[in-house]
């Protein structure tokens, strides 16, 4: 489904690019070697050249393994797993119907959503799926629009809310916001780059209203300062 590019897009020439081959084993591009080793251990000898290529038209499926969207979302959001985020990015690309799925296709899908939200897609840049690329450019306005769009669509929230980290409970918020107003009352996605920290999600106010929020802290010398600020904002949003 994905293109045969070994690496993703959106990286500088001197970056340590993560491998994004569709056939990863323990996050390493070692599927073919591992597969052959297991065949040998089972007493099966393969007398042929081995490698990765397009499936022949006369090939047939022996075993089919897949993960549900919820399984991917849970790992991607709760644990902030960048590999899973890239996998979701190319899943978006596949939804366009193009084969093989490319980063360009994924960006097209995202831009279509931005336009649907009433914003100008050419005002933003989407380089990768994980958000690690320095070539990404988004705003709090865009993230808020997406949060509101998701909230108003139950078929999205049904999958999104259970996948977000919960304050003082699990995921990347497990050790944050343990106070009486925020504990279990904030669900949000964290984001961290050098000098940057962000938090975006939902919380419930004292009157029972659901609130969406987006906090982007930039120019930080210490990430903990940004996180402390975010936690305090959430505390005030939830305070009676």
Where are these regions (language model features)?
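A small/polar active-site loop signature that marks catalytic segments
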Residues: 1-154, 158
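Small-residue-rich helix-loop
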Residues: 89-240
């Amino acid at each position: 489904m994905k293109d045969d590019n070994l690496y993703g897009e959106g990286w500088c020439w001197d970056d340590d690019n993560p491998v994004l081959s569709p056939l990863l084993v323990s996050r390493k591009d070692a599927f073919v070697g591992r597969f052959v080793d297991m065949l040998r251990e089972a007493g099966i000898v393969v007398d042929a050249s081995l490698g990765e290529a397009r499936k022949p038209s006369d090939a047939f499926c022996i075993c089919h393994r897949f993960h549900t969207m919820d399984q991917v979302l849970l790992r991607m959001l709760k644990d902030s797993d960048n590999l899973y985020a890239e996998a979701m990015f190319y899943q978006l690309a596949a939804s366009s119907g193009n084969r093989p799925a490319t980063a360009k296709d994924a960006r097209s899908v995202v831009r279509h959503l931005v336009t649907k939200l009433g914003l100008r897609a050419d005002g933003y840049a989407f380089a990768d799926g994980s958000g690690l690329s320095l070539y990404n450019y988004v705003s709090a306005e865009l993230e808020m629009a997406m949060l509101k769009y998701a909230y108003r669509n139950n078929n999205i929230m049904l999958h999104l809310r259970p996948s977000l980290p919960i304050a003082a409970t699990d995921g990347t918020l497990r050790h944050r916001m343990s106070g009486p107003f925020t504990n279990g009352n904030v669900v949000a996605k964290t984001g961290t780059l050098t000098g940057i920290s962000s938090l975006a999600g939902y919380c419930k106010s004292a009157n029972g209203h659901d609130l969406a929020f987006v906090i982007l802290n930039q120019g930080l010398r210490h990430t903990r300062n940004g996180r402390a600020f975010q936690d305090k904002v959430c505390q005030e949003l939830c305070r009676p």
